[in-house]
Design a protein with these regions (language model features):
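Surface-exposed amphipathic alpha-helical tracts and adjacent flexible/coil segments at the periphery
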Residues: 1-19, 23-33, 49, 55-83, ...
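Glycine-rich, positively charged N-terminal anion/phosphate-binding segment
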Residues: 34-51
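Beta/alpha (TIM)-barrel catalytic core signal, keyed to glycine-rich beta->alpha loops juxtaposed to Asp/Glu
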Residues: 117
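Conserved nucleotide-cofactor-binding alpha/beta core module
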Residues: 121-122
Length: 370
């Protein structure tokens, strides 16, 4: 089983390679489903191809949006240059563009994006006839649905195992376009589903905001057993630490080591198993829609009782009882109740002396941003 990792820029690319990613997906500036990512110039992409190939990894270019005639014509000389340079695969959403690529660059691998919403083996086998090599299945499929597809096709399958979930099917959502004039199907989603809304009865909540997906040891083992070729880490908009820690986490799971030690410190909106087992309200997070990280303490009187160790230099966020973000700070000098000596660390179950905003109930620590 291979790990397909994201890279939003060169720094994150190096991080993915260091974490032993087998395949890296990345985008050109101005194209693909993550236009707001930093992305790559042609020269940077060629540099990445060289670096990856020397280390036994492969590079996939994301052109996974609806394409216009002008964009197809504009991209031709760039793709020809990258094709001749050794680009391994192109990830697409647009069927017409896939046909164009197959005719003009016959030896390039064509992968079907999750944006295509290919949810049955009949369509997958049809796409194979059209020259597709691999399909990235929708996040919205359960394990039983994935298993049925695997039993009825020999197409390479790629499964998302971490990252953001969409309130709609990816590639079929018009909410951002309707509300803010930014099409999620053209790489410019404004994520209005992450906003707080109010019902006609006055109740406020993040009604449309799903938790982030994170598969564990059992889920990866099940996917290995049915013969899924690749697992995919979401995150071209995520930072270096997120890419490195998440890829390392899945490498451990593939190697049979069950661990989750750093995942709750990374960017997340709370975790769920997504649609792997079922589709119910456990997928949703109505309390907050932003990165919280790892809960490490709770206000007890005038101090904070620690649920985890905390170290000088850690960044923390203060959160109210209804999970409103009240701001954050970096931990400087460590002051612990009934402890006089200077320390760089406070331990689990100790009471930390720390100024915090009025209304604070919890403190969270995070090491990843987006």
């Amino acid at each position: 089983m291979k790990i397909v990792a994201p890279a939003g820029n060169m720094e994150r690319f190096y991080s993915a390679i260091s974490a032993t990613a087998d395949e890296i997906y990345l985008g050109l500036k101005g194209f693909g489903a993550r236009r707001n990512a930093e992305n790559f110039t042609v020269e940077e992409l060629k540099k990445a191809i060289d670096y990856a190939h020397l280390r036994g990894s492969r590079i996939f270019l994301t052109l996974n949006t609806i394409m216009t005639n002008r964009e197809i014509e504009l991209l031709y000389p760039t793709l020809k240059e990258l094709y001749n340079y050794g680009l391994d695969a192109i990830i697409v959403q647009d069927l017409g563009y896939a046909e164009y690529l197959h005719k003009n660059f016959p030896s390039i691998e064509i992968h079907g994006s999750t944006q295509m919403t290919v949810a049955n083996h009949y369509e997958i086998n049809y796409l194979k006839e059209l020259g597709f090599k691999r399909i990235v299945l929708p996040r919205e499929l359960s394990f039983e649905e994935i298993k049925e597809i695997r039993e009825n096709t020999d197409m390479e399958l790629e499964i998302f195992v971490s990252g953001s979930l969409c309130i709609s099917f990816s590639g079929n959502c018009y909410m951002s376009s309707f509300i803010g004039g930014r099409s999620g199907n053209r790489g410019m989603c404004a994520q209005p589903c992450r906003k707080e809304y109010k019902t006609s009865c006055g109740e406020k909540s993040y009604f449309l905001s799903p938790k982030d997906q994170l598969y564990g040891f059992d889920e990866i083992k099940k996917l290995q057993e049915i013969g899924v070729e690749s697992i995919k880490v979401e995150g071209r908009m995520k930072d270096v630490s997120y890419v490195y820690e998440t890829v390392s986490y899945f490498r451990s799971l593939i190697n049979g080591i069950d661990k989750e030690e750093n995942t709750h410190k990374l960017f997340n909106r709370g975790y769920s198993k997504g649609y792997f087992y079922n589709n119910d309200k456990a997928i949703m997070n109505r309390d907050y829609s932003y990165n919280m990280g790892e809960k490490i303490g709770e206000v007890l009187g005038k101090n904070i009782r620690l649920d985890e160790d905390i170290v000088s230099g850690d960044g923390v966020t203060f959160v109210s009882k209804d999970y409103k973000n009240l701001g954050g700070t970096y931990i400087g000098k460590i002051n612990v109740v009934n402890v006089k000596e200077d320390r760089k660390i406070a331990y689990k179950n100790e009471k930390l002396i720390l100024n915090f905003p009025e209304g604070t109930k919890y403190i969270f620590r995070k090491i990843g941003r987006a």
